[in-house]
Swiss-Prot record:
The keyword Secreted appears for this protein: yes
Name of the protein: FMRFamide-like neuropeptide FLP6
UniProt entry tagged with the keyword Translocase: no
Predominant place of localization: secreted
Length: 9
């Protein structure tokens, strides 16, 4: 998900 992509950090 583009919105949840930051959570992959």
């Amino acid at each position: 998900d583009g919105g949840r992509n930051f959570l992959r950090f």
